[in-house]
Amino acid sequence: MSSRKKVLLKVIILGDSGVGKTSLMNQYVNKKFSASYKATIGADFLTREVLVDDRQVTMQLWDTAGQERFQSLGVAFYRGADCCVLVYDVNNSKSFDALDSWRDEFLIQASPRDPDNFPFVVLGNKIDMEESKRVISTKRAMTFCQSKGNIPYFETSAKEAINVEQAFEVIARNALMQEESEEFSGDFQDPINIHIENDRDGCAC
């Protein structure tokens, strides 16, 4: 329906510094990869218009700094998010171990209405590197995702554009579902309680 309003979807991309968050965003939005990206300071965002199930939506992708000293910026950037993407480097076990704390950090800062059902997507990035350098297996990553409520999982390469489109397609769809559920529940935010007292001694006229 063309009369339906355009939807803005806010997607937060989290993960340790150097896992490729900025590269994934740039590959998805600009179809470009650069090996000389500087570390993100604070936060930055890119937008891309996409069609999700015949619905025109604008994806607003927020790339937040992975350094701990910038985590205090969280509240302003996380609030109003429709989906959170957790990124780690399959060749770096520390970045994988940090996923839990990034997820917890998001839930605390964003305070979603229904935290148990808030949509996350996990991306294991840099699969283009030599197999011998890989330290996190697909099985281990999937076990983690299943333990957190079957979070969708993709293995990606921003450099080679592997699974980037596919991953963001799922991210967009899940974000849209979240946005629509928030919209629906927002209609019933303040229920009206009607209490009728039956005055037996009063006039019935």
From Swiss-Prot:
Keywords: Cell membrane, GTP-binding, Lipoprotein, Membrane, Methylation, Nucleotide-binding, Prenylation, Protein transport, Transport. This is Ypt/Rab-type GTPase Rab7. The lineage of its organism: Eukaryota, Fungi, Dikarya, Ascomycota, Pezizomycotina. CDD domains: Rab7. Belongs to the small GTPase superfamily. Rab family. GO terms for molecular function: GTP binding; GTPase activity. GO terms for cellular component: fungal-type vacuole membrane; late endosome; plasma membrane; vacuole. GO terms for biological process: protein transport; regulation of vacuole fusion, non-autophagic.
